[in-house]
From Swiss-Prot:
The lineage of its organism: Bacteria, Pseudomonadati, Thermodesulfobacteriota, Desulfuromonadia, Geobacterales. Specifically methylates guanosine-37 in various tRNAs. One of its GO terms (molecular function) is tRNA (guanine(37)-N1)-methyltransferase activity. It is an enzyme of class 2 (transferase). PANTHER family: TRNA (GUANINE-N(1)-)-METHYLTRANSFERASE (PTHR46417:SF1). This is tRNA (guanine-N(1)-)-methyltransferase. GO terms for cellular component: cytosol.
Amino acid sequence: MKFDILTLFPAMFEGPLTESILKRASDKGLIEVALHNIRDWAFDKHATADDAPYGGGAGMVMKVEPIAGAIEAVKAKNPNSKVILTTPCGRPFNHQFAEELSREEGVVIICGRYEGVDERVRTLFVDDEISLGDFVLTGGEIAAMVIVDAVSRLVPGVLGSDESAQYDSFADGLLEYPQYTRPPEFRGEKVPDILLSGNHAEIAKWRRKEQMRRTLASRPELLDGIEWSKSDKKLFVEVEKANQEKVAR
């Protein structure tokens, strides 16, 4: 999986991309992350990559020519890469979006800055736009880091176990179940007995119900439209009943 990141501030990526899982994935050749300084494609001696907006207004706008040059240089080597723009105007980034991108041959991420990019970048080059949420960051670099991390962990072999991604929050539309490790008791809080029982069928059932319970409590909108299996539907009825009894107390 190849990521090409177009940015005005490539040094921002040194830490997040050179530690832990992403570093190991890169060392194994499972992912490749290339950083490209947009200013390298500027035309003047000052490497100008932004200018005042036509029509007036505050701030600066990223110029189309340097971004176009960077995209064309990258696409010349990886013509099938999908071009993504980080922007508050984009599609909300979620697990399903990350899965979509993980199936691409490569992804080019344009990190927006200032008041945004010249609209002609969108018109001529961008395949899709991504937003992390209803808030504004100082630039798209942090968003790009999030995208690389979320997509990379879905690439086969990146995680220690393929099951790690399979049971993540949102992988099946629900939040993840609670996790415990040693010690079995800490400050009066005990690990649920079922997890110590060795009964894998009952453990799986408990975990599934906990996914439902946690999702119902924290993100009930995620439950809309879920098509339950017969066994899941039975479990969810039990979870709803327990939740109603808890509220009634």
